[in-house]
């Protein structure tokens, strides 16, 4: 799924932004599944910064260099002031406002500053992960260069909840419960594959 997303986005966006987007998204997912909630929030912030730059490219044809401070408040205001019809509402309103909340969780909660004595928790991390999933789905819809059916399959697999007992090791799916028999392993693997399914050879291997 990631390779399809990568190839599609790179046809419309700078490669370094696509790489940053996918790296931070993947890290956020992995940290969430491992219950590393503090890194999850921080990576959610990095993900938001990558998407803010993608919005800059779409709206203005240029973007704030990676490593340079983003003026997110000004950017959000500028995007919402783009005349109706010149950009989609997702670019103007929905994605920026979602990123603002992700960014606030990252910068104003315990994950970034440790100022209010509140430990990061699963509630914050679950919100960040769901918001990142939604934003990724929107980006696929906006920038995909595949068929409509392929794009829909990609979106559905992005937002689909994955099983913690199945991990992907270099393209090889492995179930982590040693007490399971072949039937349980087969069912779990098929659930993890989602709507794309799996071939008989893939299941045997």
Enumerate the predicted regions with their spans.
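Charged alpha-helical initiation segments
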Residues: 1-39, 154-170
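Long, charged low-complexity segments
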Residues: 2-10, 27-29, 66-141
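Short helix-capping/hinge SLiMs at alpha-helix to coil transitions
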Residues: 37, 191-196
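Residue-level detector of well-ordered alpha-helical segments, enriched
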Residues: 39-43, 98, 131, 182
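Hydrophobic alpha-helical packing segments in soluble, helical-rich domains
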Residues: 40-62
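Long, low-complexity, charged/polar intrinsically disordered regions in eukaryotic proteins
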Residues: 110-184
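Hydrophobic residues on short alpha-helical segments
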Residues: 183-191
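Short acidic, hydrophobic short linear motifs in intrinsically disordered regions
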Residues: 186, 195-205
């Amino acid at each position: 799924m990631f390779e399809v997303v990568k190839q599609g986005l790179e046809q419309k966006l700078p490669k370094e932004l696509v790489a940053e987007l996918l790296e931070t998204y993947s890290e956020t997912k992995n940290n969430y599944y491992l219950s590393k909630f503090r890194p999850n929030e921080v990576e959610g912030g990095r993900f938001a910064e990558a998407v803010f730059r993608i919005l800059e490219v779409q709206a203005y044809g240029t973007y704030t260099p990676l490593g340079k401070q983003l003026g997110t408040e000004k950017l959000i205001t500028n995007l919402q002031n783009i005349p109706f019809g010149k950009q989609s509402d997702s670019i103007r309103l929905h994605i920026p406002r979602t990123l603002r909340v992700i960014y606030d969780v990252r910068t104003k909660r315990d994950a970034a500053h440790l100022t209010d004595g509140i430990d990061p928790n699963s509630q914050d991390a679950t919100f960040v992960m769901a918001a990142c999933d939604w934003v990724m789905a929107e980006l696929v819809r906006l920038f995909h260069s595949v068929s409509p059916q392929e794009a829909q399959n990609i979106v559905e697999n992005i937002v689909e909840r994955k099983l913690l007992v199945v991990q992907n090791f270099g393209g090889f799916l492995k179930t982590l419960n040693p007490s399971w028999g072949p039937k349980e392993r087969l069912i779990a693997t098929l659930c993890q594959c989602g709507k794309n399914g799996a071939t008989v050879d893939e299941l045997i291997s």
